[in-house]
Every structure is written in structure tokens, then in C-alpha cells.
């Protein structure tokens, strides 16, 4: 039996279908904890109870109805404990919108291997546009690497999901899954327009470089194996 800590909150999601994914795994026992309470379980001592942390959260952002969101620094103790877990070799799986978490902590993008930007900013010292999103996209996904994460996954499959036009450090990750969707600005909507101007599904005047079709990857940082899906 594998024990995982499942961390959520910060972005809406369909709760019961999501929990059912883990309920249907006969060899997995999970403990569900929401942010910020979950931060107390990020330590070497607490981590001994779990084989991996699975993060479906989006901490560090406070959305405002009339202006840009606030980006919050992670508590110093939590950040230190998180980095200690990475150095010690703990396993982490980050899911979907988790890549937008802790935007004020640049090192968080280095852990995940990329970032979704709600606002224009800088990444690795370079200016970057705000990221794009597109809901309910039906597309085909290809498995591009033999890896334990993709074991028993069909080499090609169709899925309907929200896609991102975001930043991925492709040179620093091992690709696992790629999409056949076209990741260009015309096919996505501006994240900044959504959260600042309250204009959903809008890309008027928005410009963004073509992006990666990478949907899932793994990387090693410190002694930890990191997976993003």
C-alpha cells in the first residue's frame, strides 16, 4: 500500500470525481488536506508517513474583484521545509493548475519545471507574457517516453480538458506526454484579462509566443523525482 498526501485548494475543481480517481486505486491510501493547513505536514518528520505528495493546489494567490491579484510569499518555515524535502529525495506529483502556485517564489517554478503566469512577469531573468488558457479542449495525447509514470497508458488517447499556453523549461525536463493541439495565441485566452479586467475568454490585443505542446514531464531536482501532469 502506498500512502500519499493529497493537497488541494486555491482553484475550483469537481471534488467527487477528483477524489474518485484515488478511491479507485486499490494500492493507494490518501490523506486529503487543504491549504494552508497542509503546510504543517511539509517537513522531514511528517513526510516519513507518505510515499509521495500529490499537489492539486494553487497557493500564494489572492484574487481581487477590482484589480490585479496579490501574490503572496510562502511562509519562511514552510519554504525551508519544502526545500528540505526536495533535498532529502521525497517524491512530488503536481497536477494541472498547481503550476500556477506561489508566483512570488521563483524557486517554485524551478521545482516544477515551469510556470503559469496570471500576470506578465519575469522568469529566469527574462520578461514573459501572461499565460493563456482554453477550456473544454478535446485533443489527442501521445506518450513520448517509456517511464513508470506512463506504464499501461495507451500510446495515444483522446481527452477533453483545460489547456495552458504557459512556460515550460523543456531543456530541463524529461517529456512524457505531448498534445496534438496547436499552442498559439489565437487558440487561447489571456489570463490577465480574466483576473484583472474580468473578461473571460478574451484575447483581444493579447500577444503570446507559440508555446510547448508538452502535457506531462518528469525531472530530478535535489534527490527528488518530480512529476507534472
Regions found by a protein language model. Give the residues of each.
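Aromatic-Pro/Gly-enriched surface loop or interdomain linker
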Residues: 1-52, 59
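Beta-strand-turn-beta hairpins that frame and shape the catalytic cleft
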Residues: 1-2, 220-227
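Short, surface-exposed beta-strand/loop micro-motifs that present aromatic residues
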Residues: 162-165, 205, 211-220
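Short hydrophobic segments within beta-strands
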Residues: 7-8, 95, 229
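An acidic, glycine-rich "communication" segment
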Residues: 2, 95-191
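Short alpha-beta junction capping motif
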Residues: 47-105, 223
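Short, surface-exposed loop/helix-turn segments at secondary-structure junctions
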Residues: 187-208
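Solvent-exposed loop/turn segments at secondary-structure junctions
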Residues: 11-12, 37-38, 59-62, 98-102, ...
